[in-house]
């Protein structure tokens, strides 16, 4: 994904109100309950969609937007798997749609735990493979979806992997293939919460593609339908939440 493509995503997001509204629901979920005047790191900030929303909704937060690609709208260019911050710097680490692009996602989780203050949280929204979403991601999405990935190194290309190659199966592999002892050793208080959520509104919005099948006036009812419909078979996204213990044992 080049800087030009990030600019294109910014343009579409600014012009496509229904898409920004859908993302706004996810952004608000990640912001909910963050401590007043907290210091927050956004990892994988990419086209810089989250930070303007966060700074408008929660102006009390000290926000740092980080991405691998240097861009004027983000604060720092660095690899989320090797974070350039001291231990216990942030009250929260958040992000949307970036974990499934990482060549060594468990390295990121370790780094996130390291830079979190005691009691801090990692929160993210990522693609999720379910019986409903698998064929959509596998056959209709440019990134695809692979079952049975190695959660430590989901991309076999290793160092030859392009920075923004992705696979929707990564998050499911992490949720099902990483034992609790690994999370404890990484610095969290146990296995993260992986809460599947529907994303019919996003699906009907057609994402960053041209047009939308979801009129904006139907967005509210569709989001409520998303929240009320059973998710076990239909979820397309997952909300991840991991907490660092209040103190080391």
Region locations from a protein language model:
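Conserved alpha-helix/loop element of class I SAM-dependent methyltransferases that forms part
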Residues: 18-37, 49, 53
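Conserved class I S-adenosyl-L-methionine
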Residues: 122-156
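A short glycine-rich, Lys/Arg-flanked "PGG" loop and its adjoining helix->strand segment in the class I
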Residues: 106-121
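A short acidic, Gly/Pro-enriched loop at the edge of an enzyme's catalytic core
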Residues: 81-93
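A C-terminal cap/extension of S-adenosyl-L-methionine-dependent methyltransferases
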Residues: 180-186, 190-249
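Class I SAM-dependent methyltransferase SAM/SAH-binding core
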Residues: 41-82
């Amino acid at each position: 994904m080049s800087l030009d493509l990030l600019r294109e995503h910014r343009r579409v997001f600014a012009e496509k109100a229904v898409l920004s509204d859908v993302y706004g629901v996810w952004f608000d979920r990640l912001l909910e309950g963050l401590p007043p005047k907290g210091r927050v790191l956004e990892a994988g900030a990419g086209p810089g969609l989250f930070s303007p929303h966060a700074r408008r909704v929660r102006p009390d937060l000290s926000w740092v937007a980080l991405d691998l690609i240097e861009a004027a709208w983000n604060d720092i260019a660095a690899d989320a798997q090797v974070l350039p911050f001291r231990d216990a710097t942030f009250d929260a680490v958040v992000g949307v749609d970036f974990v499934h692009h990482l060549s060594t996602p468990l390295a990121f989780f370790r780094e996130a735990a390291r830079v979190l203050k005691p009691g801090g949280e990692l929160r993210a929204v990522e693609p999720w493979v379910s019986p409903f979403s698998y064929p959509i991601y596998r056959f209709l999405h440019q990134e695809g979806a692979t079952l049975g990935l190695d959660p430590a190194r989901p991309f076999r290309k290793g160092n030859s992997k392009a920075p923004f190659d992705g696979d929707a199966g990564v998050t499911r592999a992490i949720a099902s293939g990483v034992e609790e002892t690994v999370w404890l050793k990484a610095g969290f208080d146990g296995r993260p919460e992986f809460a599947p959520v529907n994303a019919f509104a996003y699906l009907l919005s057609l994402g960053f593609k041209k047009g939308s099948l979801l009129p904006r006036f139907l967005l509210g009812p569709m989001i409520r339908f998303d929240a009320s419909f059973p998710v076990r078979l239909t979820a397309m996204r997952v909300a991840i939440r991991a907490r660092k213990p209040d103190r080391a044992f």
